[in-house]
Structure formats: C-alpha cells, structure tokens
Amino acid sequence: MVTDTISDMLTRIRNANMIKHQIVQIPATKMSKAITNILKEEGFIEDYEIYMENSYQFLLISLKYKGKSREPVICKMVRVSKPGLRVYSKSKKLPKVLDNLGIAIISTSKGVMTNLKAKELGIGGEVLCYIW
C-alpha cells in the first residue's frame, strides 16, 4: 500500500515521461484528480479519463510531447511538502517557479490550485509540488 499518493503519482508520470510512454495509469483519489485537472488546464498533459476496474478507480493520463524527437513537455516534477515535513506558505510568500515558467501546486482552503491562482485570491496553503 502506498502511503504518499502524490509522490507515487509524480513518480509514475516522471518514469513514463523518461521512457516516452503515451499513457500512464494512476490510482484515482480526490487529490490525484485535482492535480491531474490542473496539469491539463496548464497544458502539461494532453488529456485524462477515469475508468473502473474491479471496483477500483484509475486515471489514464495521456502525456504530452513536443517535436519529432518527442521531448516531454514536463521537464521536472519536484515534491515539496511530504508526510514527514509539511511545507506551508502565506499568500504573500507563495513560491515562483522559474520566474513563472513553471507552476507550484498549492492545497488551500478553497481547493487545490496553482500558485498564480492562489496569489490572485490572496490565500496561502500547503505547497505540494513544483512542475516545469
């Protein structure tokens, strides 16, 4: 059993990107659905769909590549807040990822969102990961 579903999700996507898989399968949780939705909105993945198998829900994520050499759109994914060490940030001190070329995914009281949207709304929260 996986204790940190977010790290597991990021690792599965990172591994699939390295070997240039088109689709990756991830166990569906509320958090993984929210993060996947943000990745789609921000253009890091093509699409995703939810499917059932033996009463378990899974996410099928279609990864996005650019050019003929199929370079992954996602260059790096870094887990920030971990179960052993939570990292929180106030609205005025939300991190910038590569001068806003990347995103930070923040878990706030209003839901999971990017650092830019959280800054817009003036709320802070737990910094889950950086993606660029």
UniProtKB/Swiss-Prot annotation:
**What cystine linkages occur within this chain?**
none
Instruction: Show the InterPro entries listed in the entry.
Output: Ribosomal_uS8, Ribosomal_uS8_CS, Ribosomal_uS8_sf
Check the record and name the SUPFAM superfamilies matching this protein.
Answer: Ribosomal protein S8
Sorted alphabetically, the Gene Ontology cellular component annotations on this record are:
chloroplast; ribonucleoprotein complex; ribosome
Assigned keywords, A-Z = Chloroplast, Plastid, Ribonucleoprotein, Ribosomal protein, RNA-binding, rRNA-binding
Where does the record say this protein resides?
Answer: Plastid, Chloroplast
Q: Which domain of life is it from?
A: Eukaryota
Q: Which GO terms describe its biological process?
A: translation
NCBIfam families in the record, alphabetically?
PRK00136.1
Family membership, please give it. Answer: Belongs to the universal ribosomal protein uS8 family.
Briefly state the protein's biological role: One of the primary rRNA binding proteins, it binds directly to 16S rRNA central domain where it helps coordinate assembly of the platform of the 30S subunit.
Protein name, UniProt field: Small ribosomal subunit protein uS8c
Q: Which organism is it from?
A: Trieres chinensis (Marine centric diatom)
As recorded in Swiss-Prot or TrEMBL, the protein's gene is named rps8
